[in-house]
Amino acid sequence: VGILISLDKPHYFTVAGYFVVLSFLLLMLFHKPHSVKFWITLTLIGVLGFAVEAVGTNTGFVFGNYTYGKSLGVKLFQTPLVMAINWMVLVYLVHDLLKGWNINFMLKSFVSSIILVVYDFVMEPVAIKLDMWTWEAGNPPLHNYIGWFVVSLLFFIYIYRIKLKFDNPLSRTLFLLQFLFFGALNLLFRLI
């Protein structure tokens, strides 16, 4: 309700980046085991995720033509720094979501990437409405979803190939809550 009431006050949404950071900190608090392999992998995803976002923002090549609003905080190369953490969190959550699936790593990578594309599809209208980003054409192009699929596929192939394993009792609940949050807002925005 608070979000719907404050849609005319975009400065309220500058906290969006803080929620991403808080999600990351909570995940790391309950994450186990901590290992060098885990931290190198997570850092690599963050750095490469940010780099892809920066290239995308500045060229339109990866996801299409878009610009970030102010709600995600401090930017470098017109890209919010929190996008590095966002990629880490999303890949982490989906990786843990499918940890019990005993299937070929390529198929698992494909399914994981599809899940992230569906997540993005549900999140996009809400993110646009909350000034997280704006698309040049008004709505995200197909190019955006293809970009999400390809980038996440590469991340998942890597982490499933190196057999990164961990346990986190919060991750599935956090993913479900985020998905339901964006899904509910998406539905509400269509109704009002």
Set out the residue ranges of the language-model regions.
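Aromatic-rich, lipid-facing transmembrane alpha helices and their immediate juxtamembrane interface loops
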Residues: 1-192
